Amino acid sequence: MARAASAPKKEISMEEALWKSADKLRGSVEPAEYKHVVLSLFFLKFASDKFEAQRKAISEKYGEKFVDNVAFYAKDNVFFLPEISRWSFIMENAKQDDIALKIDTALYTIEKANPALKGALPDNYYSRLHIDTAKLASLLDEIDKINTGDKENDIIGRVYEYFLSKFALAEGKGKGEFYTPKCIVNLIAEMIEPYDGILYDPCCGSGGMFVQSMKFVEAHHGNKKKVSIYGQEYTNTTYKLCKMNLAIRGISANLGEMAANTFTNDQHKDLKADYIMANPPFNQKEWRGDNELIDDPRWDGYEVPPTSNANYGWILNIVSKLSQNGVAGFLLANGALSDDGTELKIRRQLIENNLVEAIIILPRNLFYTTDISVTLWILNKNKKARVVEENGEVKRFRNREREILFMDLRQMGSPYEKKYIELTEEDRAKVTGVYHAWQQEGYEETYQNVPEFCYSASFDEVAEKGFTLVPSRYIEFVNRDENIDFDTKMKTLQSELRDLLVAEEKSKADLLTVFKELGYEIEL
């Protein structure tokens, strides 16, 4: 009897193959450590491949005399790798019992040989994890298959982005805070358009805001060299992830001397940024002591943000860093829109100072780490009428000083990964199109308030509503009850009620019959 043909194997992507290989670490490494194990190895492979390509180019152009000259690598932003740091050496020893120590040594020597990587790579990490040698070797084999030189398909970016998102997804709520979904970062970049100047993120996580901003500039044929990047990150392991993420993509950034708390150890005290993008921790409690940071210059002109919640501490930190024409896009939990007490006083002052440009409520389930509803705030230091040239395009901004644009995106988004959703390119284009039309001259022809989607509110309207920034207090929502055909609805209810009464009579008759047959007739 002929053997039945086996079902064809489902092809899996390179990213999926790597994820499966990383998942083999289960039992040897805590899931929360996967990202550090995998991404550090991936960085090592990438750095080595780039080094070998540069070494070959130097040899062909100048001869063997200069192949070990560090300057010939640095001029092209290539990290110089001592022999024991090269991927070929790691793979030659992949099955050895001391491979973890060799990986640690490789990373240590790379960092020492390249000052730009100071503080970026894990220190004595693999030896401390005691990973099963066979599982580590299997992971090395998978990473070895990657062609990191495939620039056309952005292999570097694809793998790094995929892993960061998968790790955040796997870790779920309460963890993975370092990752902001790409569609949200893209929306912020497309709204504030960081083409030229200083870009700052006060809580930069793994650097996603920077990466997508550079992609935005590239996609619009801008010059990445015109954008200077500054960031700060509190968690040391995430700080290292960010440095690696940016280094892999050839993005230069000033992330401060160390991982540090933005509030108590500001690494960029005198910075004035043209663009700020941020996704601060939501509703962070006890972010300062009762008597701490009382006279901090970042609060000048405002109340001191309460210790119970850092939301307005983040807002005022951002405001203090904006340049004369600076614009910021950042995310906060919805509670910040309507908090009372000190927060209300600060919010009112922000509105009176003409800083709030747009408030955009996002759909639920965009984030892997929380299911709470989130708001995108756009602040603008200069809402006056002016003409500017951005990336070769002349824009004529109208005066928007006593106006705020409210948008509600809760009906947008498409299913993505389990129960999550994402804002599609079409969704984002609709949102940014409305926002940019509203900002510019001639908006009377290009912008209009749309029920359940957007509304341009005056200062007086906002003041009348007690300076709340909840979009639903301004955007018109259709009362669907008004659209009901009363006669048709009543006839439907009449029919349903008749059916229920008939069924009730039948049930009563059946019950009386049963009792009568048992000899216990019920007289009504």
Language-model features: locations:
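Active-site lining segments that contact anionic ligands and/or coordinate catalytic metals
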Residues: K272-A273, N309-N311, N325-L331, V356-E357, ...
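Short, contiguous acidic/charged loop-to-helix segments that flank catalytic cores in large enzymes
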Residues: S28, W287-N309, N334-T342, P363-T369, ...
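Hydrophobic alpha-helical scaffolding
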Residues: L129, G149, C203, G231-T235, ...
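Conserved S-adenosyl-L-methionine
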Residues: G174-A278, N283-L293, R298-Y302, A333-N334, ...
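Accessory, often C-terminal, charged low-complexity segments
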Residues: F282-V304, N311, L344, Q349-E352, ...
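Conserved Class I SAM-dependent methyltransferase catalytic core
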Residues: A17, K24, E33-F46, Y239, ...
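Extended hydrophobic-aromatic, low-complexity segments
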Residues: K285-G289, G329-F330, D339-E343, I359, ...
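Non-catalytic, mostly N-terminal accessory regions of nucleic-acid modification and defense proteins
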Residues: M1-Y195, N254-Q267, I361-R364, N382, ...
